[in-house]
Amino acid sequence: MKQYLGLCQRIVDKGIWIENQRTGKRCLTVINADLEYDVGNNQFPMITTRKSFYKSAIAELIGYLRGYDNAADFRKLGTKTWDANSNLNNAWLNNPYRKGEDDMGRVYGIQGRSWAKPDGGFIDQLKKVVDDLSNGIDDRGEIVTFYNPGEFEMGCLRPCMHTHTFSLLGDTLHLTSYQRSCDVPLGLNFNQVQVFALLALMAQITGKKAGMAYHKIVNAHIYEDQLALMRDVQLPRLPFASPQLKINPKIKSLQDLETWVTMDDFEVEGYQCHDAIKYPFSV
């Protein structure tokens, strides 16, 4: 929590106002933020200075790992995070690549599981990484990236957290996740949960020990209509101790994640928090 609150305070104190063309709002912005999560010791980075929810974030992550491209599939998993971007984004609604209601296009998981090749074939980046790590292989290129500029126009949103690099040191697995843009009051809690859970799950299904997750953010910002709530309500609150994330030990393979895993397979223990804060969301 200290590093999260430190980033929030840094934005409030030192951020620069930038006009965001997509949303039409100003953002108080800083460049470069590095966060670290101790996954090996299960220090789950769930925000305690406001009520936070982890299952929706993990549901979204599972949807990415399965290669989903439809908001309805994410809703079935337990998250509505793609409803707005797939159905309320005017640019996407008028995009000829949009296939209909709830369609997200070629974003996130589609790129991770089905990256299009020039010859008409596809690359399953995630399976390659899982197979390598399961066999104790780290070729210094154990990377899953969702960032495909050649297909940006074919999706409703460019990826924010776009690349995940896995590193194997002995039998301990580490993760470095890269994020180009972060709505800190709303999105960062989701992103922290996902980075932590991704390393925990990948270590579990490849038979490795989980180590550290390194979360690198380029553009970290607070929207103008979020600033007062962050500065005057959330930042003055004292954080509670970190909770722990419990994952069903029966999850042993990528196929398990693709088929039967639900949010009932995840539980948080020891979570204490302050009251909820309703931050505005910008589509």
From Swiss-Prot:
Compartments (UniProt record): Cytoplasm
Biological process according to GO: dTMP biosynthetic process; dTTP biosynthetic process; methylation
Any GO MF annotation of the entry: thymidylate synthase activity
Gene (name only): thyA
Top-level lineage group: Bacteria
Pathway participation: Pyrimidine metabolism; dTTP biosynthesis
Transferase keyword on record: yes
Described purpose of this protein according to its UniProt entry: Catalyzes the reductive methylation of 2'-deoxyuridine-5'-monophosphate (dUMP) to 2'-deoxythymidine-5'-monophosphate (dTMP) while utilizing 5,10-methylenetetrahydrofolate (mTHF) as the methyl donor and reductant in the reaction, yielding dihydrofolate (DHF) as a by-product. This enzymatic reaction provides an intracellular de novo source of dTMP, an essential precursor for DNA biosynthesis.
Species for this entry: Psychromonas ingrahamii (strain DSM 17664 / CCUG 51855 / 37)
Binding of dUMP, residues: R22, R180, S181, C182, D183, N191, H221, I222, Y223
Name of this protein: Thymidylate synthase
Cytoplasm keyword on record: yes
EC number: 2.1.1.45
